Structure formats: structure tokens, C-alpha cells
Amino acid sequence: MSKYTILDKINTPSDLKLIPESQLKILSAELRAFLVDTLDVSGGHFASSLGATELTVALHYVYNAPDDNIVWDVGHQTYIHKILTGRKDKLVTIKKDGGISGFPKRSESEYDTFGVGHSSTSISAALGMAIADRLQGKSSNTVAVIGDGAITGGMAFEALNHAGGIKEDILVILNDNEMSISDNVGGLSAHFSKIISGGFYNSIREKGKEVLKNIPPIFEFVKKVETQTKGMFVPANFFEDLGFYYVGPIDGHDVTELVKTLRILKDHKGPKLLHVITKKGKGYTKAESDPIKFHHVAPSFHSGENITTKISKPTYSNIFGDWICQKAAKDKRLVGITPAMKEGSDLIRFSQLYPHRYFDVAIAEQHAVTFAGGLACQGLKPVVAIYSTFLQRAYDQVIHDIALQNLDVLYAVDRAGLVGADGATHDGSFDLAFMRCIPNHVIMTPSDENEAYHMLEFGYEYNGPAMVRYPRGAGIGAEITGSLDLELGKAKIVKQGSKIAILNFGTLLPLAKQLAEKYHATVIDMRFVKPLDEIMLDKVSQTYEIILTLEENCIAGGAGSAVNEYFVAKDLSNKIIVRNFGLQDKFLNHGTKDLLLAQSKLCVENISQELDKLI
């Protein structure tokens, strides 16, 4: 007999609506158990979905998706949503090749109204949907679900301001679990904490509800008193000042109260915000105690089966974490900045050693970059630790605020290239292309851990903006040496051959060496995308018949394109054969990194097929 007596009856939201409301609490417990059992096999984002279980059940119980629009922010919390919308049996395939995505994806399900992976986009998208439906005469409801971490992003404020200003009929649900991936920071987060701890304020609201129940004729009077009460005990309610009808905070794990509240709000027209308090990791004791550790889990996290202990190589993030701590000890001008990715960027130790020189600016990439510029103007040396995919969000600031003024800012760009299971929303496919065209920048692509360490040092000491890009995960185990012969814009010949030259940019150097063994080719570690080693390119063009470029970045506009541009400018394009190998002009699905590299033709077999045609 199945232990999922209620869940077994549910494949779609229509099935969910047939379940008596009195059984929703039991269903929520079954959903958590199912999530634990499934992710123990597959792995995946865990704690966020546990925290949003009752909220997800209530939303699909009250609203009529997909006719009603439910828009999720970031997507870490949507595994329960996937279970309730026809993907229960596929959850075990999540983030696997050919399986379902770890994030909402429009091409995957009609219930995934908006594709997501980055933060703070939900309110903007939901507002667009609400207006579009209204203009087309549809009577649908639109809900945006956003966390207390994501709502600190500036884009969320812009959307709130717009929605409140035009009085659009939209519900924003603030899922306040006091815990995004890294601890929330900033004034708004502190404001939420004050609300949560304000027992007197909550008791006032509960008494107000009783008054409303028992004396309906004085509804408007009580509403006015409640507004005044909030003004007395809570600093001016931010959301009501923006034009939203604010409700809450309420218990986000009381599914009965959630259903009741959502039904009321469904009939209340105009912009409204429901503030729910949840606990990330709810129902799984270890995740409740350490939600950061259980934000994402590996297979066998629960059963403990097949878990082996092995000593792994340091990741590139670890190399950065070591470098910044060591450099900070020597240079008091160094300050470290991250947009809410302390753990992922390996800044934990730095934040502990140098708390007054560590700045987590929350999900605010634009602010992070310009803030760094301000620090640089006053003589400090800021290091911005940021993922490649999130650097995209601060492009204007990189150009206008840093490059134009030639300020000393070092970008430590993590997760450059393919990231694997998280898919296209998190791949760092474009940074070389969009950074290379900006004047005043130095761009470095280390081929191993030792180069990464010394390029960080070089970029820090460089007078002007510099960028070092490095991939997710471990390197090849290269030892960090005391020094490295590193000169601005100079490449290094790794292996000497004939006829074929392979110009490698970054950590695909092992692939270049494999090809060199097969074709007796010369391998050159280019090291710098900007400036290019033009002397080396001149020698290569005079010596070799075939030139290959390798990079884990989009081909269009990337490092290989820079090489092409140089050869065209020198009128050499008709005298040599050049082939660029990098990421193709398409978005890749999730999968293992080796699989995605092969799909991008970045493997010995695919490159050999191309080379064999040319030889």
C-alpha cells in the first residue's frame, strides 16, 4: 500500500481541487515526504520547496492555473509546483539530461507561465501578463510569488512602483523565510524582521479580524484604524506607500488560513501584497537547522547510501577565496563585494576575517558595480566577486561607471562557461563577448588553478578595470607556485608542433593538448583575450596553415572572433585557415558538463571531424 494516499490521486490542479480542504494538511506532509524520497535519488533544490509547500498547495487549490497566471521568482521553490502540475513521475529526472528543468520553463509545461532562473523578475512579468489579459478581455487572475531575498533586487521595486501607480489588479505574495541563499542584508530585510518579531502588532491585527467578523457595518472604520495602527507600530508601511493593499504577515505553513486568505484576496481588486512567514527547510529537521547547506542536496543525502568520502581538488572558487584572504592581509585597501553569493563565491572566510571590508549588497548587481566604482574613486581597491550570468545584469554600470572612468575594479567572474545541471539560465556563455568590446578593460582566461591565482594578483595590481573568468568546479589539480611569468597581453607556447596551431583561451587546455597529440599541433595558452598577443598572432599566421581557437564562451563576439578581427585587419584572412570552436549560437538544455561540451562540438571527436576535412 502506498504511503501517499492522497498524493497518489493528484496529477493536475483539477485533481487537487477534488480533495477536501480538511485533508490539505495531510497532503502537504505527503508532498514533503515525496520530495525527500525523490531528491534522495536525483538530488536538487530542496529547502526552498519544503518551505513553500503549503503556499503552493493553497495557490493551486484557490486559483485556476493555467487560466490564472502564477509566476514564480527564481524557481528554487517550484518542485512542489511541478509535482502538482503533471510532473510528479518525472521529478526524479530533474536537472538530468532529457529530464525536466530545475526551474520553471514555458516549453516544459503550460503551468510554467514564465521562464526563470535569475532573481527579482516575477513582479514585472506578472504585471505584463495582467495588463495583457485585461486588454484582451480575459478575466484571469495573476499572482507573483517572490522571496524576501529576491524582493531586495531593484527590478522588483521598479515593478512594485509601476503596479501600484497604475492600480493594476495583481497579487504579489512575499514569501518571507528570512533566508535567501546567503543571509539577507539591507534595510528592507531588517524591516521584515521587525514586523515578524512584533507580537503586539500581530495581536492588534488579530483583534481587528475579530471585529470585522462580528461587526461588518464598521468595516471601513476598522480598516482606517488598522492603517493608523500600522503607522504607529511599524515604520511607514513600504508597500502601502507604493499603492498596494497590504495583508499580513500570516503563517505560511497554515494551509487552511492560506486558502481562506487567498479566496478573500482573489475577490479584492487592485494591487495587493500578501506577506507570508515560512521556514526554509520546513519539515526536515536538518534543513530547518541549516537551510544554506540543504539549499541544494546531492543524491543519497537522506538515506546515506552510496556516499563515499574522497579528497577532491580545490575548486576555482576556493582558489579565489584563498587569494583574496591572503591579499587582504597584505593590502588594507582591498575590499570584497558580492551580490548575495557569499557561499558560492567562497567569501565566507574573508567575511569572517575582514567583516568591515566585506560587503554583501544583496541581489543588486548594478549597485555592486557602481558601489565598487565609488570605493575606487577614494583610493580603495574593490574586488567584485560575481557569477558570469549575473554580471550581465550590470552591463551599463560596467561601461558607464567603471570603464569610462578607468577605475581600479577587479571582476572575479565565477561560473564562466557551462555550469551543467542548472542549464541555460545559469550558463556563463557571453561574458567574453560583452566585455571584450568595452575600452580600458583587461580580460584574462586562466587555463588552470595556478594561472587563476596569479591572474587575480595581476588584475588587482593593474591600473584600471580588469576581469578574470574561471569556471564552476574543480580544476586539474595544478599547484600554486610562488610566482608566474605573466606579462600584459602575452601568450605562452605550451607545446610545439607543425602545420596546426591551437590557440586556447581558458580551461579547455587539456582538450587542446589531446588534439595536439593526435595531430602534432602547436598549443598556445593565449591567457589574455584583451589585449591579444599580436606578436604571437603574427608569428602564428606566418608559420601555420591551420589555426584553431578554443573557448568556453559563445563563438559570436568571443575570443575567437577577436582573433578573426585581427587577421582581417592585417589582410591575412585569405592566406590562412581559421576555425573557431566555442559555444554554439543556441541555448543549451541542462545536462552534465561533458555532454554539453560535446553538444557544443568541444570534444576531440567533433573537432577531429572538422580538422580531417581541412588537412
From Swiss-Prot:
**Span of the signal peptide:** none
Annotated metabolic or biological route of this protein: Metabolic intermediate biosynthesis; 1-deoxy-D-xylulose 5-phosphate biosynthesis; 1-deoxy-D-xylulose 5-phosphate from D-glyceraldehyde 3-phosphate and pyruvate: step 1/1
Instruction: Name its co-factor(s).
Output: Mg(2+); thiamine diphosphate
Instruction: Locate the residues binding Mg(2+).
Output: 148, 177
The record's section on SMART domains has:
Transket_pyr
- Superkingdom, taxonomy of origin: Bacteria
Q: Which GO terms describe its molecular function?
A: 1-deoxy-D-xylulose-5-phosphate synthase activity; magnesium ion binding; thiamine pyrophosphate binding
- The yes or no answer to whether the keyword Iron-sulfur is present is no
Q: Which reaction does it catalyse?
A: D-glyceraldehyde 3-phosphate + pyruvate + H(+) = 1-deoxy-D-xylulose 5-phosphate + CO2
Magnesium as a keyword?
yes
* Any one of the GO CC terms: cytosol
Single GO biological process annotation from the record = isopentenyl diphosphate biosynthetic process, methylerythritol 4-phosphate pathway
What SUPFAM superfamilies does UniProt report for this protein, alphabetically? Thiamin diphosphate-binding fold (THDP-binding) (SSF52518), TK C-terminal domain-like (SSF52922)
Pfam families noted in UniProt: DXP_synthase_N (PF13292), Transket_pyr (PF02779), Transketolase_C (PF02780)
State whether it acts alone or in a complex, and with which partners, per the record: Homodimer.
The family classification in the record reads: Belongs to the transketolase family. DXPS subfamily.
What is the name listed in the Swiss-Prot or TrEMBL entry for this protein? 1-deoxy-D-xylulose-5-phosphate synthase
Specify the species: Francisella tularensis subsp. mediasiatica (strain FSC147)
